[in-house]
Amino acid sequence: MTLDDLGHFNFFGLKEFIDYYSLVEEGEKKEESLRKIFDRVKEIGGYISLNHPFHNSRKMPLGLMYDIELKYLDFLEVINSPTSNGRNPYYDKKALEALDILWCNGYKIFAVSGSDNHGMIIGDPLNYVKLDEYSTKNILETFKKGRCYVSRIGELELEYKNNGRVVYPGEEVEGKVEIKVRGKENLIWKVIKNNKVIETVIGNEIITEQVVNEKEYLRIEATDIEHEIFAVINPIYNSIEKIEPQIKRWFEIKDSIWRE
C-alpha cells in the first residue's frame, strides 16, 4: 500500500478488502490518513510491514517520508531486492540501524525481506519461517512472533538453546544462550546485543555462547567485506517490554540515522 510513493507498506493477514478511499479525506495530512488506515488494518487482525524505509536514491525515492507512529509496525523490511547484486547496500544497512533503535526502545518489531520484483529476480532475498504446521494461519502467527530469518544465501542451519532448552529466533529467553549458525558461504558473522557488536566471526558458521539479561535482545547478521547484508536472524530477547520507549514516531529514528 502506498499513498504517493513516499512510503510503502505491506499488510499481512487481511480477510477483507479495505476501502481506502472511504478512510481518506481530501486535504488531510498523510499521517492522519495512514493512521486511519492502520487502525482499520489492526481492527480486522492484520499486520503491518514498513518496506525499504531508507531507499531514497535519485531514481527511486521510495523511503518513508511521513512521521507515522511506531506502535503500528509489526515488521521492518531490512533487505529489499533493489539492493541486490551490490546495488545500494547502504539502504539496507540503514534499515538495520533502525531495527536496532526500535528494539533498544522496547519495540518488538521483527526483520523481514522482500524481493519486491519489478523486473528483477524473484526470491532474492527470502524469508524462512519455522512452522509447527503448514497452514496460512500458522504461517501468519509464526511470522508475527518473529520465528523467522532473512537470507540471500539459502536456508541456514540454526541451533539455539537457552539453559539447555531448544528455542528459536523471536522467542523470550533468560540467561545463558548457546547458538550455532551455519551457512553455505564464508561471510562475516556478527553477534549484536542492544545495538552493539559483541562478537565477530569470519567463515561459514558461528558458534557462540552469550548471556541475555533483562531488557536485552540479541541477534545475528552476516555481511561480506563490503558490508552488504546476506542474512539477518531475528532477535531473541529478555523482558524488553519493560523498556520505556524514548521514541514514539518515525522521524525520531529517521533524523537520528540520517545525521550519522
Per-region residue spans from a language model:
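Short, glycine/charged-enriched secondary-structure capping and boundary segments
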Residues: 62-65, 90, 126-127
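A general structural signal for stabilizing positions within well-ordered secondary structure
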Residues: 67-70, 103
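A short helix-to-beta-strand connector/capping loop
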Residues: 71-72, 107
